[in-house]
């Protein structure tokens, strides 16, 4: 029996038969007005879901797969004739003591719907509609005619390196795209990778995906055991991208060797092998491929290759004329907010980001005040900002889009399923346009330079402040001995920054900084305090993203620089 992860896949043999029952298309007028009104809200009655027959206006062709919590059917929209893959998830409506668990399960569905509707990438299967009944959720995806990578490996064995490289590059393109948009997949495995009829990769099943923020760690165990990173088995908190890199390493091993790197008849034995990253190559492959896999399947996350290192690796680029294209749009500072975008997305995602609207407006304020600052770039990587950009990129930033209107009146609160459906409907209300247009000048939210950021606002007006405190120094902070004044402390810090190629930006209360080590970027801030009781200066160095290995180096650079100053 197939698993639910095959949701968009159907082999050629599965396509044969079963077509006659849906061969005639139904005219839209034949669909009852009450149904059409409910469908506008995403709600369908239980009587409009007949198991094995139809869901609203979608007629079943055949079942594709089942799992512990859902099943997937191949369907056809009787109004357009379009084939779709429909993921059917029972709603948990028991109530009582299991209420929190039910809420989390519902939120996971809503998150999958939102993520799958905003991601727009040639190697990611996209959600097209979302419906719900009192007892079920229905996620309608684009239909991908093809085969699972799992089936290809099982039937044909390991792939040749040239073919495997092509598929892996397409997969890396998709993962780079989602990571750039603050999304981590968390369930990468060969069952969730389809090869379509044009021999291209389609990544599916974002049911375990989540948004990640470099400041907030995740702690949920996700994914298949064979592809799960050691830190998941150990119950450690994680940022997100690093577990996708581990899974990518296991996927590449399976592609080139025809089996998984870790296996054992005993579950405890399997877990022990994974946690030790204890594996051998069961097949001879190229030196470059082995080096890449060994760099990805590393037990310690801080020693594991980052995705950018994987993309730039020798094997991935061997024989290629160009680097991998992530299809991520160039992003400009938001100089003008499109109010029509803010409300539908903030309503739909309020279960995870209740302050989304406020954060978007804060980022907008930062964009208008200063162009190309580190603080602006840092904020542009936050999930809520990525969501706003994704919506704008899909809808083209067009102020004339009237799909969502705001008459200024306070609307009654929506139930979450209806708000999520409204957002999906809003996303597909218009053909994809161009990127955001409200731009003052050609400034991209990408890389930064020492020259552009080291002499920004505040250098000549006493900023950043050295704040007075009664507590700093007792419990935390780097003690600065024998420094005479505020200005002397700032001069020492700037000397340390310059000596270690630390890019900095002066803000009101701190230095907002960026440092690179082995192609990894660490964002952090340095704040200065004067302890009134101790009559001494102290610094705090606070990490702003998850590159802990680089941050440890940064902390040592600053603390040793203060100790060894002339």
From Swiss-Prot:
InterPro entries listed in its UniProt record: Kinase-like_dom_sf, Prot_kinase_dom, Protein_kinase_ATP_BS, Ser/Thr_kinase_AS
Active site: 187
Annotated PROSITE patterns: PROTEIN_KINASE_ATP, PROTEIN_KINASE_DOM, PROTEIN_KINASE_ST
A single Gene Ontology CC term: plasma membrane
GO terms of molecular function: ATP binding; protein serine kinase activity; protein serine/threonine kinase activity
Compartments in which it is found: Cytoplasm; Cell membrane
Gene3D superfamilies: Transferase(Phosphotransferase) domain 1
Chain sites annotated for binding ATP: 64-72, 87
Major location category of this protein: cytoplasm
Gene Ontology biological process terms from the UniProt entry: exocytosis; intracellular signal transduction; microtubule cytoskeleton organization
Compositional bias (Acidic residues): 13-22
Enzyme Commission number(s) of this protein: 2.7.11.1
Annotated CDD domains: STKc_Kin1_2 (cd14077)
Keyword Repressor set for record: no
Membrane topology label: Peripheral membrane protein
UniProt keyword list: ATP-binding, Cell membrane, Cytoplasm, Exocytosis, Kinase, Membrane, Nucleotide-binding, Serine/threonine-protein kinase, Transferase
Top-level class of the enzyme under EC nomenclature: transferase
Domain Protein kinase: 58-316
Xref: Pfam families: Pkinase
Annotated region described as Disordered, given as residue ranges: 1-27
Catalysed reaction equations from the record: L-seryl-[protein] + ATP = O-phospho-L-seryl-[protein] + ADP + H(+); L-threonyl-[protein] + ATP = O-phospho-L-threonyl-[protein] + ADP + H(+)
Recorded family membership: Belongs to the protein kinase superfamily. CAMK Ser/Thr protein kinase family. NIM1 subfamily.
Cited function: Serine/threonine protein kinase involved in regulation of exocytosis.
Protein name: Probable serine/threonine-protein kinase KIN1 homolog
Source organism (scientific name): Encephalitozoon cuniculi (strain GB-M1)
